[in-house]
Amino acid sequence: MIKIAHRGHSDKFGDNNMQSFLDAAQCGFNMIELDIQLSKSGEVIVYHDTYLDGKDITDYSLGQLLKRGIVTFEFVLFKIGPTNIPLFLDIKGDVKVVHEMVRLLKKYIKPHRMRRIYVSGFNRC
């Protein structure tokens, strides 16, 4: 049986935050699922919903999102990469996130010997 930490160890620490990801890596999960999308300024952030307080997530600057406890995908790769736990990335929102995701994965996969990254998403036409 494969144990996937949905949005990290979310039942213990909440969704898509660094503490839930690090705990999932240490608690015997086989994989971490997380949601990625773009901020207003084009950074890849880790957040599930497309709205935050009734506003589209892409209306928020990175600084505003960081103040709300939302982390960047790059920070997650930096911290989780050395654990070598596989990641399951769920792409949300604009497909432009794929280009930035690939750029960041190229930056972190080799140094951390990350072997398994799974990507899913859908785009309504």
Residue locations for each model-derived region?
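Phosphate-group recognition and catalysis centered on beta-loop-alpha active-site segments
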Residues: 1-125
